[in-house]
Amino acid sequence: MSSSPIKLKLNVKRTLLIGFAFFGILLLWQVYDSWCPTFLTDIFARRMYGMSSAELKIGGDAHKILSVQWIVGIIMACDNLAALILLPIFGRLSDKTKSPIGKRMPYILTGTFVSAIAFPFIPLFFHYNNILGMVISMAIVLIFMMMYRNPAVALMPDVTPKPLRAKANGIINIVGYLGGASATILGIFLPLSNYINTTDENRKVWMIEIPFIIASILMVISAMVLFFTVNENKIEEEIKDELEEGERLAAVETPIDDSKPMSKANRNMLFAILAAEFLWFMSDNAVGTYIGNYVIYYLNSVSSATMILTIIGGVASVVGFAIAGGIADKIGRKWTISIGLGISLIGYILMSFISPSGKVVGVNGEFSFPVLLYVIWVIK
């Protein structure tokens, strides 16, 4: 007599709790990417020209601000370079780890706590014009976030049967985006431009320290929620049969024959997809890195506008994902992706024609933000 089939059902509560790992990741990266490029611009401008970026802008020497952007780009690219090296290392180490708290949790906890401690030192060293201290703090955060990242990503598949992982991935992404949204809210209520655009005498360290401290506290809280509610070893033992059933069902639905070599057509398609992904992410990361400086130094607008752009972009992405699925069903994925990339290209081209409004609205002489850029951001 055969045993009755195991019914697979997603544990939504557990998946939401696992999502707190992504909450911490996106929270930290949003603060890091929104504040650090401007910190680097100001501190290198001061080191190279003896004046803050605000003084250079007021004095009509904005071209000197532009001249330090290559340094900013190199330093900000280090997280991607570190990811190429460190993510596979920590991923492999966590795969082989066995501990009373699981194989992923030791890396998640260590990465979280060390990053949370080092993170607030970035604005502190910046405020006191200490380039070495600031760069070292950034490096520590990068290294230990890489320790955190891969195990955090792997945790959900470890405790979720394969056929349910797509739905689970959607849930944890929502929790993660809440972390990114928390960072944008900090940027709206504590605009970086209020610090950057004022004189040295009026620059108060708390103006830039608070977002980093809050981010560190929320990261630790999210890690603690994860630790006290998700017991890796216990869950894996409890759902062992479900995981095995999930593997069996996945093998039936999408059989893969590893013994057959990849065809030339499939190989060419793979390389084309990888090339497209590479170019897309290179473009998107470049814009993401410099958008804060673009708003503060070129448009001369308040930095909170950058955060509003982030929110608008996030909402537009969610709507776009929903629409794209339906379009792909009708015209195919290839044409859907091509149309999407074409629309993004048009958005970037239009963005190059945006110029400062010239209308002073801020206490430090900031201009009003071009409304058209909000529209372009939705398009791109």
Residue ranges and their predicted role:
Residues L8-Y49, N266-V287, V378:
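Pair of pore-lining "gating" transmembrane helices in MFS-fold secondary transporters
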Residues I75-A83, I308-S317:
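Transmembrane alpha-helical segments of major facilitator superfamily
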Residues Y107-N129, G342-F367:
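C-terminal ends and interior cores of transmembrane alpha-helices
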